[in-house]
A protein has these predicted regions:
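C-terminal motif of bacterial Sec signal peptides marking the signal peptidase cleavage site
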Residues: 15-16
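Long, solvent-exposed N-terminal ectodomains/accessory regions
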Residues: 21-159
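A short, Gly/Thr-enriched small/hydrophobic beta-strand-prone motif that recurs across taxa
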Residues: 23-25, 178-209, 303-316
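Short, ordered, surface-exposed loop/turn motifs in non-cytosolic proteins
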Residues: 53-60, 197, 203-227
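Short, acidic Ser/Thr/Gly-rich low-complexity loop/linker segments typical of extracellular
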Residues: 225-239
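Catalytic zinc-binding patch centered on the HExxH motif and its immediate surroundings
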Residues: 232, 331-362
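Zn2+-dependent metallopeptidase catalytic core
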Residues: 243-247, 259-261, 289-328, 341
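Structured interaction patches on ligand/partner-binding surfaces of diverse proteins
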Residues: 261-286
Length: 363
């Protein structure tokens, strides 16, 4: 799989010598303030396709139902719901550099069991799967990258495009769109106002002298309800707050692409940065505390993240040259050597040699 090896070039592989049980793809519950579903660190299981409440067509129907005596009102297109099929990491990285926030699974499908990744069955194993995204109407699609526009959408927000509807109650319009598309179960109670999700992601590390709870620093947080998507980063104490408001219950994910310039990337399939699903939660946000017993996979990712974050920060504070940009760590608990396998930027890799060490992860 050519793209696999191209993505390995800028990588640093962290080989864990831990003898703990479990696997990088284990099912574990997460601990939050609210009762959030049990999620898995393996493939996402999709159900039926859902009606997108943010499509211009459905918002138009909601508008007619909410204001039956009002004249015809044109619903503006604020976003395109699209999907891309990058043929290699060059194309994938080009989209990422353009600020396209991509998910590897459809945003308008029922999720029967959440997980860390999805691979479209129509795409051969070993190739990059379809990447789903939301882009503005004036987005210039890069030449040569296959893409499809799936829907024209109206996503209410505090911006010029949505204010063109004048004195209409956009919160009520959004709720009505969910109701007429049979998605009312996503909504928060009407008594709860729209909220900017916020919270704290922490770990309890018994290897620390104080055995204290520490924040997971600098990781990207992703929240979405259908095509309404938002991202932010945690601060050094693990606190986060999204700038976008939600009236429905978002699905939350931690993306281990750290804001200081490194990522942690190895699921069952290789992706640029590991994603850890933490399930659907309140629109006010999720507080999550992880230890090695509650979720060993997520715990390992967080510990490595914090160690790398601290090193980058100490380099910056002391004038030491920081590691190369786009550094990637792989966490493998299947190797016995206590030394860390390191690969130089631009290294050429032998598939047989890699397979000897990481087995099924190279296939």
């Amino acid at each position: 799989m050519k793209w696999f090896f191209k993505m390995m070039l800028p990588a640093l592989v962290l080989a864990s010598c831990s003898k703990e049980g479990g696997s990088p793809v284990e099912v574990s519950p997460v601990s939050t303030k609210e009762n959030v579903e049990v999620v898995a660190h393996d493939v996402i299981e999709l159900g039926r396709k859902l009606e997108n409440p943010y499509s211009v067509t459905n918002v138009g129907k909601a508008l007619a139902a909410l204001y039956p005596t009002r004249g015809e009102v044109s619903v503006p297109v604020t976003d395109y719901y699209v999907r891309f099929l990058p043929k290699d990491t060059v194309q994938f990285n080009l989209l990422s550099d353009l600020g396209v926030e991509m998910l590897d699974h459809p945003m308008d499908c029922e999720i029967l069991r959440d997980g860390d990744y999805y691979h479209d069955p129509s795409v051969p194993e070993g190739e990059i799967t379809w990447q789903y995204a939301v882009v503005p109407p004036d987005f210039v699609f890069p030449e040569g990258i296959r893409h499809e526009i799936l829907d024209e959408c109206f996503v209410p927000d505090d911006n010029v495009a949505t204010r063109t509807l004048g004195d209409l109650d956009l919160d009520a319009l959004e709720r009505k769109a969910f109701e007429i598309t049979d998605n009312a179960d996503f909504l928060e109670p009407e008594t709860r106002a729209k909220a900017r999700p916020s919270g704290r992601i922490t770990i309890v590390d018994d290897k620390l002298r104080s055995k204290k709870t520490v924040g997971v620093a600098g990781v990207k947080m992703v929240a979405n309800v259908f095509v309404k998507i938002a991202t932010t980063y945690t601060d050094e104490n693990g606190n986060y707050e999204f700038s976008r408001k939600f009236s429905a219950k978002p699905r939350y994910r931690i993306c281990f692409k750290n804001r200081v310039g490194f990522s942690i990337g190895l699921n069952l399939i290789l992706i640029p940065a590991s994603i850890s699903a933490i399930g659907k939660g309140s629109s006010t946000g999720i507080d999550l505390t992880i230890d090695k017993n509650s979720d060993a996979t997520l715990f390992r990712r967080c510990v490595v993240n914090n160690a790398a974050y601290d090193y980058f920060k100490k380099c910056q504070a002391t004038g030491v040259t920081v590691p190369p940009k786009n550094l990637r760590f792989w966490i493998l608990n299947i190797l016995r050597p206590s030394s860390t396998l390191m690969m130089h930027h631009g290294a050429l890799l032998d598939n047989k040699l890699v397979s000897k060490y990481i087995g099924k992860y190279a296939s």
